[in-house]
Amino acid sequence: MTTNTVSRKVAWLRVVTLAVAAFIFNTTEFVPVGLLSDIAQSFHMQTAQVGIMLTIYAWVVALMSLPFMLMTSQVERRKLLICLFVVFIASHVLSFLSWSFTVLVISRIGVAFAHAIFWSITASLAIRMAPAGKRAQALSLIATGTALAMVLGLPLGRIVGQYFGWRMTFFAIGIGALITLLCLIKLLPLLPSEHSGSLKSLPLLFRRPALMSIYLLTVVVVTAHYTAYSYIEPFVQNIAGFSANFATALLLLLGGAGIIGSVIFGKLGNQYASALVSTAIALLLVCLALLLPAANSEIHLGVLSIFWGIAMMLIGLGMQVKVLALAPDATDVAMALFSGIFNIGIGAGALVGNQVSLHWSMSMIGYVGAVPAFAALIWSIIIFRRWPVTLEEQTQ
């Protein structure tokens, strides 16, 4: 049974399976944001010191995405997914057993290795397995898995960490990954590598100024977001002075708003990706600039989080669609670069937030993040006027 002859129901079921896998991977990527204080207390460290773990994870993904993708470019995709899930699960067992912060970081590097491959191939696989004419909706479903990781995975992981210890959070993620692995084995067909590209693809991609401009925009806007987002949990408790339960609720609200962004993109993304991305960057800029002023009210922070979540989902989806549209002949290479560049931004933002918190004041993370957000807004306006990309419509 091939991906071309199955019913629409089976095709959607396979996409949903990938969306569940995306939920699992993004839960483990995001969940340390809600556990920094608990992990710091466990190892008798400062919260900002533990936060460097976010940078290490992200930069390992950034460094290894392209090499791993090229090393596995000829590997059948179902087998590859199974292997990376085995690494993912084993690494979470080590996280659960971590007897020092160093061991925890090593276990997270193992997770990052699996992550590097997963996000290099997932978007293109979702498009391959989607029913005819439903590629944008398939990408939106994968993004919904990402959003659910924030709206359910991150808060639930935080709650588990609060009541049973942060180690149980990682153990539970490992169990969830095992169940997902069994579903992948059952549901996915053989998936020969297609349009994966090779090192020969790199010079071709690098000669596409529109694509390179999207990559630059990605790293700048993601740096802006993660400068503040990485430390939102200690910010809410230590700067705003609100309870740990409110911090959990705020993370849930921000993630839930991402689902709204996913729905908006599913309806408008095919025709208006450029406008949506620029508008979302402007919205992110406003949210970051107002983060500290909004900290005097739970309601203000809640409303801000809704718009923040919508903005980041629109940005992430819009960038992804444009990358796929601008590199249809080497989707896996292009997405490996995108994943790596995205994680450079995550690591850079977490590092900036770390340095601001240690050497200045955690209260300033929003203002500092607004600086690259403003630069990203200007750059997006410039590049979308110079290269008014409509190619995303051709991928549908």
Swiss-Prot record:
InterPro entries: MFS, MFS_dom, MFS_Efflux_Transporters, MFS_trans_sf, Sugar_effux_transptr_put. The keyword Transferase does not apply. Keywords: Cell inner membrane, Cell membrane, Membrane, Sugar transport, Transmembrane, Transmembrane helix, Transport. It is found in: Cell inner membrane. It is a multi-pass membrane protein. GO terms for cellular component: plasma membrane. One of its GO terms (molecular function) is carbohydrate transmembrane transporter activity. It comes from the Bacteria. The chain crosses the membrane at residues 15-35, 50-70, 81-101, 103-123, 136-156, 170-190, 209-229, 246-266, 275-295, 299-319, 333-353, 364-384. PROSITE patterns: MFS. Pfam families: MFS_1. Involved in the efflux of sugars. The physiological role may be the reduction of the intracellular concentration of toxic sugars or sugar metabolites. Belongs to the major facilitator superfamily. SotB (TC 2.A.1.2) family. NCBIfam families: PRK03545.1. HAMAP family: MFS_SotB. This is Probable sugar efflux transporter.
